[in-house]
């Protein structure tokens, strides 16, 4: 099973950007979404993210993530409609203010979740960690912790699937449509998953220590990450995106 944040090789301009600039572009889109207050701007930022994903060849993964987020966005919309009492009543307990606020919150949720995932799809985690150390002067231990946590996401997913398959072979039915019953079935799986995660974390820490983890500096990487003309142009575009979010 392909994880949604796995690196997708490619030779597009998005792939060739400095990893720090990719993070800056993703952050600019997210900030612009939070600053925006119109449907045009929110939909525009969402469309921009999907267009970048299509250009990089990862739009299918973005749509799969979008499908997972839509139910959560709908729940947020229902909560906004239920508890927002300001404005004029449109129908029943629904007010125009609640409808507008809830729909914008849904668009923000969908728009904020995609940019960072997109940048992770087109960036190797080793390059991301080393670029943060070299360009941003982030201590290597923090960059390593962040990228290692991302690497563990698919590992834990595979562990959970293996545990569920073992329990299914014993007659446990996880395909129930009752969410409360499914939650009760899933909670006991957290214990073996936690034990497995602690073991993997301890093994990773020992391996890193034996390889001289604490001796590593920004000069330890053989690969350099200079800021080129294309990177500067993208940074200027990122600033413009924040300005657009502020104005609209």
Question: Predicted regions span which residues?
Answer:
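Transmembrane alpha-helix interface motif
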Residues: 1-41, 45-48, 162-248
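Buried hydrophobic packing residues in well-ordered domains
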Residues: 18, 62-63, 119, 153, ...
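Structural signal for the C-terminal ends of transmembrane alpha-helices
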Residues: 35, 51-59, 122-123, 246-247
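Membrane-helix interface segments
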Residues: 39, 58-59, 138-142
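Hydrophobic transmembrane alpha-helix segments characteristic of membrane transport
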Residues: 46-52, 127-131
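Alpha-helical transmembrane segments and their membrane-interface exit regions
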Residues: 48-58, 72-78
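Interfacial helix-loop-helix linkers and transmembrane-helix boundary segments
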Residues: 58-67
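Juxtamembrane/interface alpha-helical elements of multi-pass membrane proteins
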Residues: 69-173, 180
